[in-house]
Regions:
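Active-site neighborhoods and metal-handling regions in enzymes and metal-associated proteins
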Residues: 1-595
């Protein structure tokens, strides 16, 4: 038996004792986070799949894992040798979890499915209960966490220190943010609100932590009432300075595990709960007269950056650009010298970023995919998959950093030597899509779905497409993936506004061959106002040359060439003062105009 088989055997022994026919393991934590602390990586532990999105379902005789297109190839590799069947979300013929359970349990008498109500959202569980009932006879149990019994040496909840995010970077005081939140609550006719999302809590309180790898958040809950603010957090995370700061801002402190009791005794008439962010367990604990089921107002506030945050991004992008130039100057000669691998170049890039002021961490695990690994959208090199780089072909490097004044996210695909005509064609198509999105002008309030088509159109014309989103929001020294605004094919109702930060990251992936992605972090800013309304534009924040060697210039429109040359001129002008002479010469060559 391999390790996954042993874990499944232990789980099934427990399921048998508990009279459960199946158990569902999500990728989330008690706060519905995308990236979670080690304590909550239960889906990874039970399946072996380490992607940030996916759901594992285990019955007494079978197991399956659902994930999205970013992870199809990675999941295929990681699930190999296990009994897990890979379910490719949104692909024709892929059953839903409920459909699969209906088939797997059709001959089971009085089947009961289990899940942990603490790590599943209220809306998810509510919909699941309804769907299982429609199948007939399948019930759902929500009060069991099997990992507490079968996961030996399970990591404990993190207890890392919390720090204050200075006002010079936050740009708005805690008191001002709470006042804005309370105003929104009054408009929603709510007396209070439970905040579960960790990045929303960090933003509202101007605090940061290190409880989650790459994400500067801390495990906690926040209760905002009309006359009181309560933070539920382990006391040992808070220094005397942080406690005094919270006291000065009239924030009461309670232990993290007291939130349930507080909700049970909540005295206001009603409370706002976001069903996508609040766990089923805590929702059911609320005993007040009325629950206002509505989306949290915080993400929309957090999405529009203030002047200090925007200046912080610009500063962070300068530092990150300097690190990237040093890295790219080093890369090709190092590969030609031999011995460099996907992992070793990742370590080099991180070390160069760490030399920059205000560097705190990387913002996600670097994706450095050489040759066919570049076609795995969210590839992460391991000692088992790591390969030596050769002075030929393409390498896709998607990386980012957390600086105290801003978060960065950048992808560059680099030609390490000779490239094929097919590589040039695909590379140039991706570049065209990237540029077209950055050229677009659009009405204030347009949706990300409308913009998505602008970037993809040149690919669609040739029958190409990519299945991930074109862009996601980016936090301000917070999570690198931030909502509610996105640019993607699926309908995104959130209106785009000036001050929002996003990524522009189209890509094309040829399985078994190579992948190309080009990504800038961008800012939505004012363009003009006319009798027809206010119009917005996209401004690149990322400062780093785009490799011009794999470009088929004949494929580019004049306006695309003009954009690239203007962008490269800006990159050189802004970065060169921070480089030595050799680096300046390299950057000048990397940013010289194309014709």
């Amino acid at each position: 038996m391999n390790e996954i088989e042993l874990r499944l055997a232990r789980l099934r022994e427990l399921m048998k004792r508990e009279h459960l026919s199946a158990f569902i393991f999500p990728s989330t934590d008690a706060h519905q986070s995308e990236y979670v602390a080690d304590h909550w990586r239960g889906r990874e532990w039970i399946s072996g799949f380490n992607g940030s999105a996916g759901t594992a379902v285990v019955t007494m005789k079978s197991a399956a894992l659902w994930t999205d297109s970013r992870y199809f190839l990675a999941a295929e590799e990681q699930l190999e040798g296990t009994e897990y069947q890979l379910m490719r979300l949104k692909m024709e013929g892929t059953p839903t979890i409920v459909e699969w359970l209906g088939k797997e349990l059709q001959n089971v008498q009085s089947p009961e499915v289990g899940l942990d109500g603490i790590v599943n959202s209220y809306n998810y569980v509510k919909d699941l209960i309804y769907s299982l009932r429609k199948l007939g006879g399948i019930t759902l149990r929500t009060n069991l966490d099997p990992l507490e019994q079968i996961w030996e040496n399970r990591p404990s909840l993190p207890a890392n220190p919390v720090e204050i995010q200075p006002l010079e970077y936050a740009g708005e005081t805690l008191a001002s943010k709470v006042a804005r939140i309370r105003k929104s609550l009054r408009e929603l006719h709510a007396d209070g609100m439970l905040v579960s999302a960790l990045d929303d809590i960090a933003w509202a309180l101007n605090l940061r932590g290190t409880d989650v790898h790459c994400n500067p958040v801390f495990v906690s809950y926040l209760l905002i009432e009309s006359d009181k603010v309560s933070l539920f957090v382990d006391d040992n995370k808070l220094s005397p300075e942080v406690k005094q700061y919270l006291q000065d801002n009239q924030v009461s402190l309670y232990n993290y595990n007291k939130v349930e009791k507080c909700l049970e005794s909540y005295s206001e008439y009603n409370i706002l709960l976001d069903g996508d962010e609040t766990s089923y367990y805590l929702w059911k604990a609320v005993k007040c007269q009325e629950i206002v089921a509505a989306g949290s107002p915080i993400p929309a506030m957090k999405a529009v950056k203030n002047k200090a945050e925007i200046e912080g991004y610009r500063s962070a992008m300068l530092k990150d650009g300097v690190a990237m130039v040093k890295f790219l100057k080093w890369l090709k000669p190092a590969v030609e010298a031999g011995g460099q691998t996907e992992i070793s170049i990742d370590e080099k890039l991180t070390s160069l970023r760490a030399e920059q002021k205000l560097f705190r961490d990387i913002s996600f695990d670097t994706i450095a995919g050489y040759a066919q690994h570049g076609a795995i959208v969210h590839y992460e090199a391991t000692p088992e998959t790591d390969v030596v780089l050769k002075p030929e072909g393409l390498i896709l490097i998607d990386s980012g950093a957390q600086y105290q004044d801003g978060t960065t996210d950048i992808t560059r695909t680099i030609a390490l030597g000779a490239v094929s005509e097919e590589m040039k064609h695909i590379y140039t198509l991706v570049l065209k899509a990237h540029i077209q999105l950055e050229l677009v002008k659009f009405p204030d309030g347009a949706s990300g779905t409308q913009l998505d088509a602008v970037g993809r159109e040149c690919m669609w014309r040739e029958g190409y497409n990519f299945l991930h989103g074109t862009g996601h929001g980016v936090g301000s020294y917070l999570c690198v993936h931030e909502g509610p605004h996105q640019i993607r094919m699926e309908w995104m109702p959130t209106p785009l506004r000036a001050g929002m930060t996003l990524t522009d990251e189209p890509g094309l992936y040829l399985a078994g061959k190579f992948g190309v992605r080009i990504e800038n972090t961008v800012l939505i800013s004012d363009y003009m106002s006319t009798e027809f309304g206010k119009f917005l534009q996209i401004e690149p924040l990322t400062l780093c040359p785009i490799d011009t060697t794999p470009i088929d210039v004949d494929m580019l429109l004049p306006e695309e060439i003009d954009w690239l040359n203007a962008y490269h001129h800006s990159v050189y002008e802004k970065l060169s003062p921070f480089l030595d002479e050799e680096e300046k010469i390299w950057l000048e060559n990397a940013t010289k105009p194309i014709k």
